[in-house]
Amino acid sequence: MFFEVICLATAAAQGVAVGDLIPREVLFGNPERSSVSISPDGTMLAFRGPVDGVMNAWVQPVEGGEAKALTNFSDRPIGGLSWSWNGDQLLFSKDAGGDENFHVYVVDIAGGEPRDLTPHDGVRAGISETSQERPDEIVVSMNKTNPQFMSMYRINTRTGEQTLIEENEGYLGYILDDDWNIRGRAAMNEDGGLVNELRDVGSDEWYEFLTIPSDEMMNTSMAGFNKAGTRLYGASSLGRDKAALVWWAPKKGGGESPTVVFESDKADVSGGIGNPDTYEPEAVVVDYLRPEWHVLDSALAPDIEALQKLDQGDFNISSRTKDNRTWIVAYNRDNGPPRYWLWDRDTQKGRFLFTTWPALEGAALASMRSVEVPTRDGMKMPSYLTVPVGSAGKNLPMVLFVHGGPWARDSWGYNPYHQWLANRGYAVLSPNFRGSTGFGKEFVNAGNREWYGKMQDDLNDSVAWAVEQGIADPKRIAIMGGSYGGYAVLAGLTRDPELFACGVDIVGPSHVGTLIGSVPPYWKPMMKMFDDRVGSMDEPAYIDAISPLTHVKYINKPLLIGQGANDPRVKISESNQIVAAMNKRGLPVTYVVFPDEGHGFHNPTNNMAFNAIIEEFLAAHLGGKAEPVGDDVTNSTAQLRDKGGLSLAGAKTHVVTKGEDEPVELSVVAIDELSPEEQQQVQMVMAQLSQMPIEQLPMVRDQMMQQRAMAPPESQKLINYIIGQLDDKIEQSTKQDG
């Protein structure tokens, strides 16, 4: 049945009682439907749904009928699902093994195999533009000719024909008008600012339009032209703290005097919708603690007002028909899974479609509180607190859950991690520490060069607040996070170990220098921003000082690390090197690697496996409740490289030495086998290595092994010799410490 009334009623009747453990499979299994959109003519729905446990593309008639899977990928989930304007095809993206080299695919809704529109090895591609006037074409950005820069291509979705629009010779991005003319481009200058240039239609002459200083770049940007090409819309914090919606006249000198469309003194303008015919803004969203809609076009006022009453939670308009009369509206609740509605603008009535996780309807889910947490220097951190259902919220074990980025933010709404941890008996606090985005330039810039410093102080202040409020038991606090949040975990356990009972690091970097030195090539044009906001490789002492690996000897609390072997952002060597350093010092660590994952765990069986390990880990060190591990770990690809004292029944430890993922035999090379030029290179490399902390050498060895795999035969002897020297240094260090 199309509408899941029976399913919802059954779930509600069988609701999980307060105190019962909600199974991980229910909390972290695939949603039945997500990423819902409506076809241009309003007759069909598209959504992501599982096929044998992997998220694929589906379609279903709006008026009911059987849903049909259009793809059958078994290795990785699809993402970015959307309709082509021709109404006959769906577009989506997919990578391989978590490498984040996403390709653009198309599939016909009538059936047939999906086709890769960007079938190039090692290339990253994404859709930049679509158009009602060109329904069979899209504009794609792709680093096919230079891995650092994205060139622009026009691709026919029916034939697959590619036409180069603009070869990128060093720009961070482009702006196209409605006719797909390249009208704007941007490049970073020596000061870390962004120089925006424009050109007029039919002209090859570029002129400087607006230079955005480095301290404004997180809050000021150009988005795109209106359909007429007379206004260039964007966000600007120039002359103010919070980013406002503005437009510039696209002409010489026009960058100096933007027109403000809407601004708020609470937070940045962070979202909204535009007219699909004119590309003029119709409404904007400002999100401080909760999203607030502000109508710009009075024609939308009745819709927005009615949608605010249609269902619980905060809504967003996720898809619209070509005539803009029918919308797909998603509601985000804190104590229930998201719900999708069909909104008829003519009748001003909504029709419930489905919920993303029907099994969670009626479950005893917790509410999320929006709170302001003070910092020691007088700032306020918009934060989100969840406590167990039925709990008084006092003297609880607590998980400080740190978001990644760090130039991102946490928001109010349904969060499976908050629900899971609260269901196991923990309070969960997610602070938006300085450096988080969305709260104005002063707040984000306060995090500049404060990794391991004031950004970490903010996390400690969050702990202090929770203890002072009587929420958290000071002896039972864990710190957990992914990406930058994982870095914050390592920083917390090395800088302030007395605050935390344990830590969970998910794909977090352990050394800022090795992180910067191994970023994907398409990040390199932006590295000046990293220099200004984090630190420069030209100041190695500072980089060492803000790197947890440097301070590894201070870890005296249990640590769990999860890592994807194919992570292109935070390489596996980041986790390998801190695990090696801890092992050398006899410090306990639980280390889990997933060979088929990247920056995060997207395969549900892998995600559930790692969460099962987290659950046992937290129960052991904080005393919360835990669902038995069962077969969750053995059903995944998890490699338990170090159990760290955990007794994971049925799971075998997979031991990997020296950070190698696969054993590789290396031939022994003597120095006299190398040419004079190669011997000189060895001297230079070894001189550099002599200046590095010994803890970093396993990571360097990993990188040399990766280079060896790609190097031509004539370079093998040189690389083998250097690896041999590294092995000797690592072995000598181990013997000395022993």
Feature locations, PLM:
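Bacterial N-terminal signal peptides
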Residues: M1-T10
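Boundary at the C-terminal end of the N-terminal hydrophobic targeting segment
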Residues: A9-G15, G19
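Mature N-terminal segment immediately following signal peptide/propeptide cleavage
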Residues: A17-V51, N56
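Peripheral, non-catalytic segments that deliver or gate enzyme domains
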Residues: G29-S34, D52-A57, F73-G79, W85-P382, ...
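Beta-propeller domains
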Residues: F47-T71
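Short beta-strand element of the alpha/beta-hydrolase
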Residues: K394-G404
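Charged, low-complexity interaction regions
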Residues: S690-P698, R708-K717
